[in-house]
UniProtKB/Swiss-Prot annotation:
Gene name in the database record: gmk
Protein task: Essential for recycling GMP and indirectly, cGMP.
First-tier enzyme category under EC: transferase
Organism: Methylobacillus flagellatus (strain ATCC 51484 / DSM 6875 / VKM B-1610 / KT)
UniProt cross-references to NCBIfam families, sorted A to Z: guanyl_kin
The Guanylate kinase-like domain, residue ranges: 3-181
GO cellular component, one term: cytosol
Stretches of the chain forming a coiled coil according to its record: none
Keyword Kinase tagged: yes
EC number: 2.7.4.8
The family this protein is said to belong to: Belongs to the guanylate kinase family.
Gene3D superfamilies from the UniProt entry: Guanylate Kinase phosphate binding domain, P-loop containing nucleotide triphosphate hydrolases
Protein name: Guanylate kinase
Keyword Ion transport in annotation: no
Length: 202
């Protein structure tokens, strides 16, 4: 693979989506893999930009055809990552971000051993609950379920290569940028990227 595959995971409300958007805004060499989902769009979300929004029957059809690199059911909705999209982006030399949960991360790591996994933690459960309430998108019952799911998800933090705490947005963003830069500078990636230059020097 010419590009790097980054897995970014976080509990709902930890700020993952905002951090990923900020990463994309400042880096033309990195792309976000747009997942398929059966959940309804949130305010401001666009089909094909934030997610490919599909009916459950269509999702199951794609799943049965083996189109998904990984898939999972989260908060009652299905999510899946297109394998062909991932492979083509990496082959073209782009770094690719997968915004997926810990279950999807396990599936991807079993297929892409050199994928780089990052877990974003909230500074506290109280801060996480406040962020979920501030979004004003879910009922108290749904928020309670999300908090319970967050505790379960965070138990898998030890399975990831890198961890950052999103206490201050800019600090967490700089952590992510540092991780991406360090991976781009790894010997095996540099020798592929600058193959012509290296051959002339040796």
């Amino acid at each position: 693979m010419k590009g790097n595959l980054f897995i970014i995971t976080a509990p709902s409300g930890a700020g993952k989506t905002s951090l990923v958007r900020a990463l994309l805004d400042g880096d033309e060499h990195i792309k976000l893999s747009v997942s398929h989902t059966t959940r309804k769009p949130r305010p401001g979300e666009e089909d094909g930009v934030h997610y490919h929004f599909v009916e459950e029957a269509r999702f199951v059809e794609l799943l049965n055809h083996g189109d998904f690199l990984e898939s999972a059911q989260v908060h009652g909705a299905y999510y899946g990552t297109s394998q062909s999209t991932v492979n083509s982006a990496l082959a073209e030399g782009y770094d690719l971000i997968l915004e997926i949960d810990w279950q999807g991360a396990q599936q991807v790591r079993s297929l892409y051993a050199d994928a780089i996994s990052i877990f974003i933690l909230p500074p506290s459960m109280e801060a996480l609950e406040q962020r979920l309430n501030n979004r004003a998108q879910d009922s108290a019952e749904v928020i309670a379920r999300r908090l319970a799911a967050a505790r379960e998800e965070m138990r898998h933090v030890t399975e990831f290569d890198y961890v950052t705490i999103n206490d201050r947005f800019e600090h967490a963003l700089e952590d992510l940028r540092a991780i991406i830069r360090s991976q781009r500078l790894r010997r095996e990636k540099q020798l592929i990227r600058y193959q012509d230059v290296v051959q002339k020097l040796l």
